[in-house]
Amino acid sequence: LNEADYVAQNIRTSKDGSSFDIYYKNNLLCNLKIQLTGKHNIYNALSVCASLNEAGVDIDSVKKYFVDFTGMGRRFQHVGSVNEIELYDDYAHHPTEIMAALDAAAVKFGKENIVAVFQPHRYTRLKGLWEDFRGAFDNCFRVIVTDVYAASEDVIEGISGENFAKTLEKAEYMSGNMQSVAQQLFPTLKSGNVVIGLGAGTITFLGKELQNCGENLLCR
């Protein structure tokens, strides 16, 4: 396919999702609405529509499935709420994935409400993509960096969550396991904040630990 055969135009986004027109060779193919936000999700939907159209499927007959689709597990997944604070979990552990996740979050909730909690995954990845990671957190007002999830790797001297946090103006370092991180983070959160855990390790348990804090006076 020529890269210009299928194009998404008139893109409209809100906290409820995205809608856009799909053009095929400059002719309107359909209007599509999805529950997801973020450019990457729009591109994904566009790719699916292109594949279906090439296979001869009537796009209008399957549009409702796009509306019903709420996303994959651990991809900007809503895992609960506590004290009017929304909790999300995302597997993103690469700079481009983090940027995509935070872009979607900012569209839905506003950059000024997003608290990103980043658990670096592997010392070698953090070292190799150090500068790329530093540029991945524009779409949030606050960044929490935890200890590195080693994934069986040996420690690399000088490469740590604490040292990485020092390179970001709006970042803070919080040490320990996810229970400890939640206990440090919870008292600093406010109603309306949206916490999104980012990483491929134990960060996935952060939402549950924050909910536990909401029920535990020791966290306040």
Protein language model features and the residues they cover:
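Beta-strand->loop->alpha-helix junctions that form or flank phosphate-binding loops
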Residues: 1-14, 33-39, 63-67, 175-176
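Acidic-glycine-rich active-site phosphate/pyrophosphate-binding loop
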Residues: 12-30
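Nucleotide phosphate-binding/pyrophosphate-handling subdomain across enzymes
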Residues: 24-142
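Short glycine-rich anion-binding loops that position phosphate/pyrophosphate groups of nucleotides
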Residues: 93, 120-123, 148-151, 200-203
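Short amphipathic alpha-helical segments
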Residues: 100, 128-130, 156-157, 186-187, ...
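C-terminal helical cap/extension that packs against the catalytic core
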Residues: 134-191
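Short, flexible loop segments at boundaries between secondary-structure elements
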Residues: 145-148, 215-220
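A glycine-rich beta-strand to alpha-helix segment
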Residues: 180-213, 218
